C-alpha cells in the first residue's frame, strides 16, 4: 500500500476500519435478539480487502 493513496482507496479503507469492530453490548440485551457476535469481523493478517 503506497503512502500516497487515492481518495477512493482511502475511503474504502476508512469504511472497512469502521465496520471492523465488535458488536455493541446493548444490542445483545434487546428482547428476541439472536445476534451473538459480529460475523463479518476481519483480521488484517488473515483476510485481505482486495483493493
UniProtKB/Swiss-Prot annotation:
The protein, known as: Large ribosomal subunit protein eL39
Subunit and interaction comment: Interacts with YIH1.
GO molecular function, one term: structural constituent of ribosome
InterPro entries: Ribosomal_eL39, Ribosomal_eL39_CS, Ribosomal_eL39_dom_sf
Keywords: Ribonucleoprotein, Ribosomal protein
Biological process according to GO: translation
Any matching Pfam family: Ribosomal_L39
GO cellular component terms given for this protein: cytosolic large ribosomal subunit; preribosome
Region called Disordered, residue ranges: 1-22
Family membership noted in the UniProt record: Belongs to the eukaryotic ribosomal protein eL39 family.
Amino acid at each position: 500500500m503506497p503512502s500516497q493513496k487515492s481518495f477512493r482507496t482511502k475511503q474504502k479503507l476508512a469504511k472497512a476500519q469502521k465496520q471492523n469492530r465488535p458488536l455493541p453490548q446493548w444490542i445483545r440485551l434487546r428482547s428476541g435478539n439472536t445476534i451473538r457476535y459480529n460475523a463479518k469481523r476481519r483480521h488484517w493478517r488473515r483476510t485481505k480487502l482486495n483493493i
